Amino acid sequence: MGSDADDKIREIVELAKLYDIYGDMLSDHNRVVFEDYVLNNYSLGEIAGEVDISRQGVRDIVVRCSGKLRRYEEKLGFLKKINETEAALNEMEDMINAGNTDPEIILYCVRKARETLVK
């Protein structure tokens, strides 16, 4: 039971991150509808009344925008790079917090973080 809710939360977080990166590539109208549904948690009915379209029209826009954002990520991969860089930096932070301040290991982590940005 909790798994479906967890999956929905993960999907919303992913869409919010994709929107932060690629949202400006959506039309103004689509951006308003997507923001209201995904980021502001408005219902389809609330948005439909606000922008004067049907609830099905709102749903179609949200689905279409979600697909566009995912396709942008497939082609450009900015979120993947951000996540990989964050993981490399977290690894470096964990090593330092564990008392491992060997310059060679820290340099390795810095290079690893840099690689995630340039590949």
Residue ranges and their predicted role:
Residues 28-39:
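Short amphipathic alpha helix immediately N-terminal
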Residues 24, 49:
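Alpha-helical residues within the helix-turn-helix
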Residues 61-64:
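Residues within the DNA-recognition helix of helix-turn-helix
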Residues 76-101:
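Intrinsically disordered, low-complexity basic tails/linkers immediately adjacent to helix-turn-helix/homeobox/MYB/SANT
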Residues 7-22:
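Short, Lys/Arg-enriched N-terminal segment that forms or immediately precedes the first helix
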Residues 33, 47-48, 58:
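Hydrophobic positions on the alpha-helical face of helix-turn-helix-like DNA-binding modules
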Residues 54-55:
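Helix-turn-helix DNA-binding motif, specifically the short coil turn and the N-cap/start of the second
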